[in-house]
């Protein structure tokens, strides 16, 4: 699977002159996104793993620095980011271990922890001043479980509370993301 996805990305990148590629996945897709970053770190600008903690003892760290966001829901019983044992008996790597391992591997010099509220309660951890100026971010939603943030409750298995009336005007949007593009 990883090699096939890599080949598709390379063909697309060459044909359309794409510079920065971001990989994002949810649940098993988050595990796949993280595995892609570990196997081919030079192919991506950044990776985002949404509720896809790696299986206990199988978490990977790329050989080269890459920007990384790992998002988890504290009430997730499918792929738990904190308690590690899922409702079906599988064990997953704690989100904090992944964050700490990546931060250590890429020699990050600063670590900040911010608790904030944006419709839900969050704890955000950011490791900065790392090799190649990458950032490692851990974002724990303390009020949700195994959900894609903001999706309507009636859509698919991975649903959350309806947030269609969410007031996004309080957000500060810019043309640049945290990684400068």
Regions found by a protein language model. Name each.
Residues 74-136, 144-173:
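Active-site-adjacent alpha-helix of alpha/beta-hydrolase-fold enzymes
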Residues 14, 19-66, 77:
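Primarily recognizes the serine-hydrolase "nucleophile elbow" in alpha/beta-hydrolase
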Residues 8, 27, 53, 74, ...:
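Residue-level signal for short, function-critical loop segments
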Residues 1-16, 35:
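Alpha/beta-hydrolase active-site loop
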Residues 3, 27, 38, 89-93:
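Soluble non-cytosolic domains of exported or imported proteins
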